[in-house]
Amino acid sequence: MKEVGIVGYGSDLPKYRIKAEDIAGAWGKDAQAIKRGLVVNEKSVPGPDEDTATISVQAARRALSRAGINPKDIGAVYVGSESHPYAVKPTSGIVAEACGVSPDFTAADLEFACKAGTAGIQMCMGLVGSDMMEYAMAVGADTAQGAPGDALEYTAAAGGAAYIIGAKKEELIAKFNGTYSYTTDTPDFWRREHEHYPKHGGRFTGEPAYFKHVLNGAKGMMAKMDTTAKDYDYCVFHQPNGKFYISAAKQLGFTEEQYKYGLLTPYLGNTYSGAVPLGLSNILDHAKADDRIFVVSYGSGAGSDAFDITVTDRISEVVDKAITTEKLLESKKYVDYAVYLKYRGKIRM
């Protein structure tokens, strides 16, 4: 397969936030203990007019701004999410139409818990690398839900990022050196049809689920590339909370300097399918030519996708062509628990 890489990327976040103290206060919990345990201080809250489709459209348009290509040249659009607005009606079609891609393209909505976005990137790599098309777009986005009073309510957040994959060397802002996946049947987190909120295995979501897959996915990628943590300038992992992310990074030998730009959960919460794509977007916003990035996603059920990426000198030309992830994080408005319940549709009669 020929060399492929990222030619454009973009991110989007709702402006609304809720602090852990407001959620904990509503349930009589110790906010400081929760913040220490999860390493999460606040999370994003989608407004009443925001969903996975609107977030994906904004992220995709910003990716197009950075890529500087004709959207009609994109041959595939994939949107990975746990929270597609419709059970039957593709989000990918909405995104493509809003971005001027349609009608000569293929599209699909993807699901694999929190790694559907990175699965889409792998699909785009294959389609572009095999010369089936010139460009392909993958989006990872979610407006995640947690049941009132559940531990997930402190982290389940909203946001997403889009990536346009191409192969023209002069257009690449980052190239893929390799990818690796590790997948099993592990029932750590699930939601059946017609259920409003997901269920999870509590502590079972840790060692036998998240850590097993992230660490094995990472080790498999390093073995394939014959590398160690010292060979990379940055890293990003799936982040259901800050504690898991930091633990995984340290177990693999990464330092805070390497993992800090990818870690957004303390200020954003867990954006599910958007978590790793958003973390990677923040790294790209800060990266320079020849920086090497190590990426590992995780999706419950369960699996991990890993990537080895090298940034090119074109990165400096495109960063300022769209709003950065850091600027989106800084643009925020806090809401209280009552407004949060209203915006998330949690008040049910």
UniProtKB/Swiss-Prot annotation:
What reaction is this protein's catalytic activity? acetoacetyl-CoA + acetyl-CoA + H2O = (3S)-3-hydroxy-3-methylglutaryl-CoA + CoA + H(+)
Q: Which domain of life is it from?
A: Archaea
Annotated residues for binding of CoA? 203, 243
Any GO BP: isopentenyl diphosphate biosynthetic process, mevalonate pathway
Which amino acid positions bind (3S)-3-hydroxy-3-methylglutaryl-CoA, per UniProt? 30-31, 114, 155, 205, 238, 270, 300
Keywords per UniProt: Acyltransferase, Isoprene biosynthesis, Transferase
- Which Pfam families does UniProt cross-reference here? ACP_syn_III_C (PF08541)
Q: Does the keyword Ion transport apply?
A: no
Question: Which pathway, metabolic or otherwise, does it act in?
Answer: Metabolic intermediate biosynthesis; (R)-mevalonate biosynthesis; (R)-mevalonate from acetyl-CoA: step 2/3
Family matches, as InterPro entries: ACP_syn_III_C, HMG_CoA_Synthase, Thiolase-like
Active-site feature positions: 82 (proton donor/acceptor), 114 (acyl-thioester intermediate), 238 (proton donor/acceptor)
- Give the enzyme's EC designation: 2.3.3.10
A molecular function annotated in GO for this UniProt entry is:
hydroxymethylglutaryl-CoA synthase activity
- Quote the subunit structure annotation: Interacts with acetoacetyl-CoA thiolase that catalyzes the precedent step in the pathway and with a DUF35 protein. The acetoacetyl-CoA thiolase/HMG-CoA synthase complex channels the intermediate via a fused CoA-binding site, which allows for efficient coupling of the endergonic thiolase reaction with the exergonic HMGCS reaction.
The UniProt function text for this chain reads: Catalyzes the condensation of acetyl-CoA with acetoacetyl-CoA to form 3-hydroxy-3-methylglutaryl-CoA (HMG-CoA). Functions in the mevalonate (MVA) pathway leading to isopentenyl diphosphate (IPP), a key precursor for the biosynthesis of isoprenoid compounds that are building blocks of archaeal membrane lipids.
Q: Which family does it belong to?
A: Belongs to the thiolase-like superfamily. Archaeal HMG-CoA synthase family.
Name listed for the protein in its UniProt record: Hydroxymethylglutaryl-CoA synthase
Q: Which organism is it from?
A: Methanococcus maripaludis (strain C7 / ATCC BAA-1331)
Q: What is the lineage of its organism?
A: Archaea, Methanobacteriati, Methanobacteriota, Methanomada group, Methanococci
